[in-house]
Amino acid sequence: MKIYSKLAALAISAFVMVSCAQAQQTETRKPGHFTKVHSGGSWEVILTEGNTEEIRIEAKGVDLDKVKTEIDGDVLKLGLVNGNYRNVSLKFYVTYTDLEGLRCSGSGEMHVESDVIAEDFYIGLSGSGDVYMKNLRADELDASISGSAKIKIQSGSVGEAEISQSGSGDFVAEDLSIEELEVSKSGSGDTFVGDLGEISVRSSGSGDVVYSGSPRMGDIKVSGSSSIRKR
């Protein structure tokens, strides 16, 4: 009977440990000041503007002490401590006071739910992750996509924009007006933008550039089956 009792106790303890590991854990952190956010992994990041910098973490399948929220210069880095992880569900709710750039590597998603106003804004994607923005107003935009990642901007206006694409990733911003646009692309990724003042394109592969308005045509060099056309 004692053996059975010990086995039962061990089974209960193991069940409790597994249940705790699978339960959702929540923590709020004050990381310090940052203006850019880098997410590297398969999780979701939701960003909103506020009066103070703050991160709320929702984690399932991983201990919170394995979740990294580090400041490197003016960059907030989100991720996990090096290790082997399975069945991890992780979500970051980031509150910022000033936002100047986003970087996403891996298969995660970043959602900016507030309007963003900036002098210079940078978006860099590699892998299959996506960035979604509600509204962007900036003097200059530098956007880089590699792999199958996608950038989607619902609306806004930009003075000068440089968009670099390699692979099958798309840049989708049909209601984003741009005074001067320069596109450099290879592969099958498409570029959709709004009203343009001037456009320059260097494209190889099958990716298209689709725009609105009647822009001045700058330096246009196209090879492959790519097309540049008005919507």
Region annotations inferred by a language model:
Residues 1-231:
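Intrinsically disordered, low-complexity terminal regions
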